[in-house]
Amino acid sequence: MSKVKLSGIFTALITPFKNDFSIDEDTFSKLIEHQISNNIHGLVPCGTTGEYSTLSFEEYCRVIELCVKVTNKRVPIIAGSGSNCTQETIKRTLYVQSLNVDAALVVVPYYNRPSDEGIFQHFKAVHDATDVPIIIYNIPQRTAIDPNDVLLARILSLPRIIGIKDATGDVSRPLNLKLLIDKEFALFTGNDATSLGFYAQGGGTGCISAVSNVIPKIYSDMHNAFFAHNIKEAMDANASIFKLSKVLFCQSNPSPTKYAMSLIKGISPTVRLPLVELTQENKLKVENMLKELNLI
């Protein structure tokens, strides 16, 4: 089991596709190098931004394998391994465990509409069947379930549940969880627009970010400045993060992020159905913001 303490800005990597919708492995490898060279603290393959739900199991395994190989332990990896099927989640989590990733990111099960007890038993089953650190992924805007703090604290009480990624934007949640459980755990926000507030008010330890695909250095600089008590520098960087986050979610993620990366790095904006590429109106929004931030 990894002993790495997980904190900082972890980029939720896009999965680049070629025009025929196959995985562009060469571009994915270059994207990882770009992230690491821009001081990102960690990487998250096969999360929401990585379009994991449209990957076959074989493709999923290849993306994780390639990320581990290219990264070569230079930064920690939290691998997405969740689904709404407990047995499938166990299968994926055992796979990422075999590659010695630093943690698995397990989403709250969606679509089935499980009860509180069902959610707990899902995480307990994955926990008990594996030996890799697990991070809860709470994103109710996609799962239609927002577990209450008591339930989250109960899940966090399991020994190898080491943290949570909370994408609600609720900066009070970390404080509430700390009151409910006597255990040190990683507190990642998944809401780019409120990441600095999550640090300042909630005691957050990091962000798993879609926006950092586009601005890894600005994002890591914000984190580093805040924890070095350089608040003005952190706020200046956060201004860019906040502005960009507003346009990168103008349409379903990761379509706007992929379009931005096509303008900055020449990466294909191709997404897999049922997602589609940006409308012309939204393309213009992204282009204008990138110009405003001097990114193109």
Curated annotation (Swiss-Prot):
InterPro entries, per the entry: Aldolase_TIM, DapA, DapA-like
Gene3D superfamilies registered for this protein in UniProt: Aldolase class I
Q: Where is the signal peptide?
A: none
Q: Give EC number(s), comma-separated.
A: 4.3.3.7
Q: Which Pfam families match?
A: DHDPS (PF00701)
Q: In which pathway does it act?
A: Amino-acid biosynthesis; L-lysine biosynthesis via DAP pathway; (S)-tetrahydrodipicolinate from L-aspartate: step 3/4
Cellular location of this protein? Cytoplasm
Keywords (alphabetical) are: Amino-acid biosynthesis, Cytoplasm, Diaminopimelate biosynthesis, Lyase, Lysine biosynthesis, Schiff base
Question: Where does this protein hold pyruvate?
Answer: T49, I208
Q: What class of enzyme is it?
A: lyase
The Gene Ontology biological process annotation of the record reads: diaminopimelate biosynthetic process; lysine biosynthetic process via diaminopimelate
**SMART domains for this protein:** DHDPS (SM01130)
Keyword Amino-acid biosynthesis recorded: yes
Q: How does it assemble?
A: Homotetramer; dimer of dimers.
This protein is called 4-hydroxy-tetrahydrodipicolinate synthase
Q: From what organism does this protein derive? A: Ehrlichia canis (strain Jake)
- What does UniProt list as this organism's lineage? Bacteria, Pseudomonadati, Pseudomonadota, Alphaproteobacteria, Rickettsiales
